[in-house]
Amino acid sequence: MRIDVESQNINVTSLKEAPIHLSGQIQPHGVLLVLEEPGLKILQVSNNTWGILGINAENILQKKLEDLLDSFQIERIQSGLSSGNLEFINPTKIWIRKKGDDYAVFDAVFHRNTEGFLILELEPAITQENIPFLSFYHLAKASINQLQKTANLRDFCQIIVQEVRKVTDFDRVMLYKFDDDGHGSVIAEEKLDSLEPYLGLHYPESDIPKPARKLFISNSIRVIPNAQAQAIQMIPALNPVSDRPVDLTNSILRSAANCHLEYLHNMGVGASLTISLIKDNKLWGLIACHHLSAKYVSYELRKACEFLGRVIFAEISAREETEDYDYRMNLTHIQSLLVEYMSQEDNFVDGLIKHQPSLLDLTSAQGAAVCFGDHCTLIGETPKAEDLVFLVQWLKNNVEEEVFYTDSLPQVYPDAERYKNVASGLLAIPISQRNYVLWFRPEVIQTVNWGGDPNQPFEVNKLDGNVRLCPRKSFELWKETVRLTSLPWRYVEIRAALELRKAIVNIVLRQADELAQLAHDLERSNAELKKFAYVASHDLQEPLNQVANYVQLLEMRYQDQLDADANEFITFAVEGVSLMQTLIDDVLAYSKVDTQAIAFQLTEVEKALDKALGNLRQRIAETGANITHDPLPTVMAGSTQLMQLFQNLIANAIKFRSEEAPQIHIGAERLEDEWLFSVRDNGIGIDPQFSDRIFVIFQRLHTRDEYHGTGMGLAICKKIIECHRGRIWVESQLGEGATFYFTIPVGGRERERRNGRKTQNNLFS
């Protein structure tokens, strides 16, 4: 009876992670004993000793190993056990008397499990497949010679399975490689002509789940001589010392999981031999040998295959590195150029995107983005900047590693499906908690050939009222169209991204130190300059007043005695003194913006505006100016400075009016964390090329004959806004009026603003 897995609410994950190594069962072709050192007392034994040793299991338990073996063998074993490395005695030949003078010879293998118990495994010694060392050496040498003749990794893998099949004489030999997601695929196969090919087929992670893969790392070679044989139970089931099932992680006789045996049965496999290919302590792949019928593999042949597997995989690793070498060297060259470009630019981002090769070339991506603070610099084909804001926030909340990469971003971040055409793949490196460098790859629709439906890796049988998980029975070709995926990121590309991260962090840190030093020097210089301007303005007032007084006295007393030229000269002197007094007053006002502590308090903007309009009432009346405003908020600001700001901006709008009467409007808009104010007029306008220059001290766009003034008004406005941690700018076209914008943060950091200090550099926050 078949039932659906989901409808029964079965926890498939827990079943896949069952502790196989604690099953307490072994395969029937050998005997396993659990010994307690140092006396080698037999604590547990497999329940098949009568058929193999001719001794009942009950007669062995609680005895010592010396009761089974002669003193010579015990002495040899004790010597090997004391050496510290059990490989020196594995395997060792053991003779056990069965009846009378009838002895049986066994291959004995020792190991200590995680609990510290000594495990002894006995297999009948079969000599017909014994491979002497020199024969094996020549076999390995011949295989390697064949392998070294191949041109690429794919051909190399095909030679591997051919050579292993020659050695083992199995009906089918496959090389199975794992993907990063745990799925696997057959990349090489050698088989009987009558068998259906598995080459190129993919298999889901559930076929070889994580616990099984961990055991393949612990046991680099596994043999199942008869997949139909009944497993043998250990007796007693629990170790009498630990009161737990014995740990058989490293046992060569350990029985396979029932689910795996049924899986082999469904594939028509009678025996299997598996050689693990391990790289950097991870399971890279397997050489899987299948036979249609039962097939025993001697210990010597297994060790030969294990050694051959290690030699072969060393060559595989070398081939992989060789095939990656040219690409890796090219990426290293690109990386060194990018570091050089970044070092030469004031802004390191320019070094990544303005030159060739660029950031895209480092990972063979179609798009990239450098997101620093609230700004993203884009290159190539990327999602929109507003989409990247949310993506970076997701990375910040969910990723803690130094690098994040995926070839199916929509699977982990569903919002990315909207821009799958440019960003189905993502490689991201954090420069800090809020700053990222991102690379993107577009969707590549693929057809994957599976060995059976990957969406139905298990079936459920319900017999006698019991629900039992069992593997699928169908391994027919099942084609799947895979969407929302990109080409995978290669290991060398990920490493290159990590190396670039280190370089960027070093450059940013160095630039931050340089900027901090420059800021310190500039702050000191500005402080000295402001102090000088303040003192100089003060000290110049008195002599200038004397000059003004004497010139006016000269004009009053001798006006009738002087000719027209002399009177004109006196007029010029009076005007010059007046201009100088205005200039000194403006310089003094400019210096006071920073030198006098601003009294930050909740200020009604409308009241500050009213005071400014009151100071300008005469000019407003003379020009017929019409001034309107939106409802204005209350902000944390210096009321006097806010009044001066409006007064300067409105005075400018009146001064630089067109032929029409001035129309001036003050607007206010609440943004996320600041207020945006605007002062719009219908005056003569400003050429956009001068939009920055007008805020520089003493800068004028017109002569004094055209418009009076010192060029200080907008510079003072800029200083006031900077003290409030805001921004000020102008948008205008010549002849079309101008709109001045400025911002003031919502709320306030009163102490920070009062002290005139900048917030801590948040580059690495």
UniProtKB/Swiss-Prot annotation:
GAF domain segment(s): 152-320
EC number: 2.7.13.3
Region (Chromophore binding domain): 20-510
GO BP field: detection of visible light; regulation of DNA-templated transcription
GO molecular function: ATP binding; phosphorelay sensor kinase activity; photoreceptor activity
Disulfide bonds: none
Catalytic reactions of this protein: ATP + protein L-histidine = ADP + protein N-phospho-L-histidine
Residues with Phosphohistidine modification: H538
Stored InterPro entries: GAF (IPR003018), GAF-like_dom_sf (IPR029016), HATPase_C_sf (IPR036890), His_kinase_dom (IPR005467), HisK_dim/P_dom (IPR003661), HisK_dim/P_sf (IPR036097), PAS-like_dom_sf (IPR035965), PAS_2 (IPR013654)
Designated name of the protein: Cyanobacterial phytochrome A
Organism field: Nostoc sp. (strain PCC 7120 / SAG 25.82 / UTEX 2576)
Gene that produces this protein: aphA
